[in-house]
């Protein structure tokens, strides 16, 4: 239990500083929830073990770390929304309009900055915009992949015997790719 407590404490204190005061662009919006949940689970386990052993000093340390993790948890949707891979300038502008403040997500922007701006009050709106941006991003990726598929398809127009007409070679592959992409496009939901 000592190793868990000290490793979790050391890692959390470093990570907490980076999360609040480090560049927001360094935070991975996709991993943040799992990371915070892992910290919470580890420190809860250590807290339970030291409570059972009656080691008050270690319990106190675990409680301090637990408090820090608990305090951070409500910020996760805000971080996920603003650090979504799909966030584009138009989304930031939309958010800026909604809250009546200019937001600039550059290297100088930190979670502390977001908190000072009062963005925690808009966490739900930010999460929705982030979710929309994420869906748009998935569609962008799918469209790029579809375009790439077409680059590999060659169509040839061949003379058909001596009739003066032509036939299309590669038609079967073309229709197969087209059918797959139509199905994929219909499955995309926004």
Task: Label the model's feature ranges.
Residues 1-190:
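Extended alpha-helical scaffold segments
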